[in-house]
Amino acid sequence: MKRAHLFVVGVYLLSSCRAEEGLNFPTYDGKDRVVSLSEKNFKQILKKYDLLCLYYHAPVSADKVAQKQFQLKEIVLELVAQVLEHKEIGFVMVDAKKEAKLAKKLGFDEEGSLYILKGDRTIEFDGEFAADVLVEFLLDLIEDPVEIINSKLEVQAFERIEDHIKLIGFFKSADSEYYKAFEEAAEHFQPYIKFFATFDKGVAKKLSLKMNEVDFYEPFMDEPTPIPNKPYTEEELVEFVKEHQRPTLRRLRPEDMFETWEDDLNGIHIVPFAEKSDPDGYEFLEILKQVARDNTDNPDLSIVWIDPDDFPLLVAYWEKTFKIDLFKPQIGVVNVTDADSVWMEIPDDDDLPTAEELEDWIEDVLSGKINTEDDDNEDEDDDDDNDDDDDDNGNSDEEDNDDSDEDDE
């Protein structure tokens, strides 16, 4: 019965059209690879895999919609398990009611969440529950936590990574105790934050790195921040990254979108929408980068840039919810609790705001001069005006009726 359900769902999810050899898109083959986890089989399964992916779910209800939603999640996991079958990654489901004791032991407390066990670490996946996103996330997770830079061409590739937090350190060798501490620190943040290292003096010179020094790069910033007081312990590196992991300007990414959205400041986000591939969107993004660089020392400023191309399924929802047109650049302040929002007036694509105008608008947001509560008040005022109009219309009708009665007399 399970396979029959999965095949039905798979027909809707995946195209079965034939393609030329070399471009055969994976379709679910009907083999069950995702198993139910229990206290009895937990240790056996844990020993079998280097990485264990666990979907912690509420008991499946009798509601047909809930059942279909569960089956959709199940087929996504089955497809991911099929694609990564050769990678020694296990996939299991944990029923919150049947396996409550095991879930408590593992520290699971949020139904509908996906957890990954790697060694003694538990990583919660806080991104889009889609097969392609999950595959990329898990492949990043099984790689070494630190990528080694050995040449000037690799330095160029490193420098082109601008929308991620990244760290790079210079060490004597892979056997160095300080490199080991760096590697251990990297495991705490894998795969969300990228760690790089070099043992090459030429590479270190090009990056202005001294022996045992680590530079911290905030997204979209021109210059790195050297971490003070080298050499560092693992704990010191972890503490520094945690204190600086909310950038001034960051990109909303499918692999950690919910974690980013929950990391708000006082319940709000400053949200620009801009397509990087579009000329106007690219220009607007460059202006935003300039504003972020000029205000990188402001701890109260956090801007979450969204490229609509990254989230095609959400474009219509955002346009309806925020009442904006995402075919042109936008910037607004969004209340994460109720999605109330206020958006900067941008007349047209040919008249984008300058960096100074954006800074003034952002200052008004941070000071509270512009806020989503004002938008609520305006809506209430509009409703009151409409009520007054209705009252006036009602009174006019009564007066007309009175006049008619007098005429009849």
Swiss-Prot record:
Q: Name one GO molecular function term.
A: calcium ion binding
Tissue expression per record: Detected in heart muscle (at protein level).
GO cellular component terms, alphabetically, are: sarcoplasmic reticulum; sarcoplasmic reticulum lumen; terminal cisterna; Z disc
Subcellular locations according to the entry:
Sarcoplasmic reticulum lumen
Q: Which GO terms describe its biological process?
A: regulation of cardiac muscle contraction by regulation of the release of sequestered calcium ion
Primary location class: other
Signal sequence, start to end: 1-19
Q: Which residues are glycosylated?
A: N335
What ranges does the record give for the region Disordered, renumbered to this chain? 364-409
Family assignment?
Answer: Belongs to the calsequestrin family.
Free-text function comment from the UniProt entry: Calsequestrin is a high-capacity, moderate affinity, calcium-binding protein and thus acts as an internal calcium store in muscle. Calcium ions are bound by clusters of acidic residues at the protein surface, especially at the interface between subunits. Can bind around 60 Ca(2+) ions. Regulates the release of lumenal Ca(2+) via the calcium release channel RYR2; this plays an important role in triggering muscle contraction. Plays a role in excitation-contraction coupling in the heart and in regulating the rate of heart beats.
Question: What is the name listed in the Swiss-Prot or TrEMBL entry for this protein?
Answer: Calsequestrin-2
Taxonomic source organism: Oryctolagus cuniculus (Rabbit)
